[in-house]
Protein backbone atom coordinates (compact mmCIF):
# COMPACT_ATOMS: atom_id res chain seq x y z
CA UNK A 1 0.00 0.00 0.00
CA UNK A 2 1.29 3.45 -0.91
CA UNK A 3 1.53 6.12 1.73
CA UNK A 4 1.60 9.00 -0.77
CA UNK A 5 -0.22 8.23 -4.04
CA UNK A 6 0.23 11.77 -5.43
CA UNK A 7 4.01 11.58 -5.01
CA UNK A 8 3.89 8.17 -6.72
CA UNK A 9 2.01 9.70 -9.68
CA UNK A 10 4.50 12.56 -9.99
CA UNK A 11 7.42 10.12 -9.77
CA UNK A 12 5.93 7.92 -12.49
CA UNK A 13 5.52 10.96 -14.77
CA UNK A 14 9.10 12.13 -14.02
CA UNK A 15 10.59 8.67 -14.66
CA UNK A 16 8.60 8.17 -17.88
CA UNK A 17 9.81 11.55 -19.15
CA UNK A 18 13.43 10.70 -18.33
CA UNK A 19 13.05 7.38 -20.19
CA UNK A 20 11.34 9.23 -23.10
CA UNK A 21 8.23 7.05 -22.89
CA UNK A 22 5.16 8.04 -24.88
CA UNK A 23 2.65 7.37 -22.10
CA UNK A 24 2.41 6.38 -18.46
CA UNK A 25 -0.27 4.51 -16.49
CA UNK A 26 -1.15 5.46 -12.92
CA UNK A 27 -3.74 3.90 -10.59
CA UNK A 28 -7.02 5.81 -10.70
CA UNK A 29 -8.42 8.10 -8.00
CA UNK A 30 -10.49 11.28 -8.15
CA UNK A 31 -7.59 13.40 -6.90
CA UNK A 32 -5.23 12.01 -9.56
CA UNK A 33 -7.88 12.54 -12.24
CA UNK A 34 -8.12 16.19 -11.22
CA UNK A 35 -4.33 16.58 -11.23
CA UNK A 36 -4.07 14.99 -14.67
CA UNK A 37 -6.87 17.22 -16.01
CA UNK A 38 -5.02 20.33 -14.80
CA UNK A 39 -1.80 19.09 -16.43
CA UNK A 40 -3.67 18.68 -19.73
CA UNK A 41 -5.44 22.03 -19.40
CA UNK A 42 -2.12 23.83 -18.77
CA UNK A 43 -0.44 22.07 -21.72
CA UNK A 44 2.03 19.90 -19.81
CA UNK A 45 0.65 16.60 -21.15
CA UNK A 46 -0.82 15.65 -24.52
CA UNK A 47 -3.85 13.64 -23.42
CA UNK A 48 -5.47 11.99 -20.41
CA UNK A 49 -7.57 8.83 -20.76
CA UNK A 50 -9.49 7.48 -17.77
CA UNK A 51 -10.29 3.77 -17.61
CA UNK A 52 -11.90 1.71 -14.84
CA UNK A 53 -8.81 1.15 -12.73
CA UNK A 54 -6.13 3.42 -14.18
CA UNK A 55 -5.37 6.72 -15.87
CA UNK A 56 -3.27 6.76 -19.04
CA UNK A 57 -1.35 10.00 -19.45
CA UNK A 58 0.15 10.69 -22.88
CA UNK A 59 3.31 12.70 -22.35
CA UNK A 60 4.23 15.77 -24.37
CA UNK A 61 7.62 16.46 -25.94
CA UNK A 62 8.92 19.52 -27.75
CA UNK A 63 11.73 18.81 -30.24
CA UNK A 64 12.49 15.56 -28.43
CA UNK A 65 12.72 17.17 -24.98
CA UNK A 66 10.09 16.77 -22.24
CA UNK A 67 7.75 19.73 -21.77
CA UNK A 68 7.84 19.15 -18.00
CA UNK A 69 11.30 20.01 -16.72
CA UNK A 70 10.52 19.62 -13.02
CA UNK A 71 7.95 18.25 -10.59
CA UNK A 72 8.03 18.82 -6.84
CA UNK A 73 5.70 17.47 -4.16
CA UNK A 74 5.14 20.14 -1.50
CA UNK A 75 2.53 18.90 0.97
CA UNK A 76 3.15 15.35 2.15
CA UNK A 77 1.10 13.07 4.43
CA UNK A 78 3.56 13.78 7.25
CA UNK A 79 3.85 17.52 6.65
CA UNK A 80 0.81 19.31 5.30
CA UNK A 81 1.38 22.76 3.80
CA UNK A 82 -1.55 25.17 3.61
CA UNK A 83 -1.56 28.60 1.98
CA UNK A 84 -4.06 31.43 1.95
CA UNK A 85 -5.38 32.96 -1.25
CA UNK A 86 -2.87 35.82 -1.16
CA UNK A 87 0.09 33.61 -0.22
CA UNK A 88 -0.07 31.30 -3.27
CA UNK A 89 3.52 31.09 -4.57
CA UNK A 90 4.72 31.88 -8.08
CA UNK A 91 6.63 28.94 -9.51
CA UNK A 92 9.84 29.70 -11.42
CA UNK A 93 8.87 33.39 -11.70
CA UNK A 94 5.59 32.56 -13.40
CA UNK A 95 6.94 29.91 -15.80
CA UNK A 96 5.44 27.04 -13.81
CA UNK A 97 2.25 26.26 -11.93
CA UNK A 98 1.33 25.15 -8.45
CA UNK A 99 -1.63 22.89 -7.78
CA UNK A 100 -3.82 23.27 -4.70
CA UNK A 101 -6.56 21.21 -3.13
CA UNK A 102 -9.21 23.76 -2.14
CA UNK A 103 -12.80 23.79 -0.95
CA UNK A 104 -13.67 24.47 -4.62
CA UNK A 105 -11.84 21.33 -5.77
CA UNK A 106 -8.34 20.83 -7.13
CA UNK A 107 -7.21 24.07 -8.81
CA UNK A 108 -4.06 25.56 -10.28
CA UNK A 109 -2.56 28.55 -8.48
CA UNK A 110 -3.86 31.23 -10.87
CA UNK A 111 -7.45 29.97 -10.74
CA UNK A 112 -7.33 29.69 -6.95
CA UNK A 113 -5.99 33.26 -6.72
CA UNK A 114 -8.76 34.53 -9.03
CA UNK A 115 -11.42 32.73 -6.96
CA UNK A 116 -9.74 34.02 -3.77
CA UNK A 117 -9.49 30.58 -2.18
CA UNK A 118 -6.53 29.01 -0.43
CA UNK A 119 -5.90 25.40 0.41
CA UNK A 120 -3.37 22.61 0.62
CA UNK A 121 -0.39 23.16 -1.69
CA UNK A 122 -0.02 19.78 -3.39
CA UNK A 123 2.80 20.26 -5.89
CA UNK A 124 4.72 22.55 -8.21
CA UNK A 125 5.31 21.86 -11.90
CA UNK A 126 7.60 23.75 -14.28
From Swiss-Prot:
GO terms for biological process: translation. Pfam families: Ribosomal_S8. One of the primary rRNA binding proteins, it binds directly to 16S rRNA central domain where it helps coordinate assembly of the platform of the 30S subunit. Belongs to the universal ribosomal protein uS8 family. Gene3D superfamilies: 3.30.1370.30, 3.30.1490.10. Keywords: Ribonucleoprotein, Ribosomal protein, RNA-binding, rRNA-binding. It comes from the Bacteria. GO terms for cellular component: ribonucleoprotein complex; ribosome. This is Small ribosomal subunit protein uS8. The lineage of its organism: Bacteria, Pseudomonadati, Thermodesulfobacteriota, Desulfovibrionia, Desulfovibrionales. Part of the 30S ribosomal subunit. Contacts proteins S5 and S12. HAMAP family: Ribosomal_uS8_B. GO terms for molecular function: rRNA binding; structural constituent of ribosome. It comes from Desulfovibrio desulfuricans (strain ATCC 27774 / DSM 6949 / MB).
